[in-house]
Amino acid sequence: ADGTITFNGKVTDK
C-alpha cells in the first residue's frame, strides 16, 4: 500500500 498506517502506528510505503 502507499502511506498505510500499521498496527504499531508506523507509516509504511510498500
Swiss-Prot record:
Keyword Hydrolase: yes
EC number of the protein: 3.2.1.14
pH dependence of function: Optimum pH is 7.
Keyword Hydrolase: yes
UniProt keywords, alphabetically: Hydrolase
An example Gene Ontology molecular-function term: endochitinase activity
Function statement: Has endochitinase activity.
Protein name as catalogued: Endochitinase
Annotated organism of origin: Glutamicibacter uratoxydans
